[in-house]
Curated annotation (Swiss-Prot):
Residues 20-27 form a propeptide. Its cofactor is Ca(2+). This is Acidic phospholipase A2 S13-69J. It is found in: Secreted. It catalyses: a 1,2-diacyl-sn-glycero-3-phosphocholine + H2O = a 1-acyl-sn-glycero-3-phosphocholine + a fatty acid + H(+). It comes from Austrelaps superbus (Lowland copperhead snake). Residues 1-19 form the signal peptide.
Length: 146
């Protein structure tokens, strides 16, 4: 093996060792799912919200089909506002607490983390208040969301 190859291999190993000491950061979407479970007291699994109506899940267009779908539209709009502020809402980790009255943001000083946490807490509480209509899960968005 050439000396240059050994240097490259050594550099890779050292950088991997350094990366191993950095604790993994939770993705915001995982935290959001915990907030949803906290707000609805575990009455409905988080995956029920991933393909609901026109706005719950990835993307969104058209007129929301009901109150729950409006919660998702509002959450999408909140994330869009966060992005305008230079935040990365799907990657922002924050500190929250699950209390008797549902989730709330806790001791957050950074503006982006606070903004995103507020988006997620409000959406989770909205989900818990809104009725869930099984007929609006996994709908044909090409027909119903124009």
């Amino acid at each position: 093996m050439y000396p240059a190859h050994l240097l490259v291999l050594l550099a890779v190993c050292v950088s991997l060792l350094g990366a191993a000491s950095i604790p993994p950061q939770p993705l915001n979407l995982v935290q959001f799912s915990y907030l949803i479970q906290c707000a609805n007291h575990g009455s409905r699994a988080t995956w029920h919200y991933t393909d609901y109506g026109c706005y719950c899940g990835s993307g969104g267009s058209g007129t929301p089909v009901d109150e729950l779908d409006r919660c998702c539209q509002t959450h999408d709009n909140c994330y869009a506002e966060a992005e305008k502020k230079g935040c990365y809402p799907k990657m922002s980790a924050y500190d929250y607490y699950c209390g008797e009255n549902g989730p709330y943001c806790r001791n957050i000083k950074k503006e982006c983390q606070r903004f995103v946490c507020d988006c997620d807490v409000e959406a989770a509480k909205c989900f818990a208040r809104a009725p869930y209509n099984d007929a609006n899960w996994n709908i044909d968005t090409k027909k119903r969301c124009q």
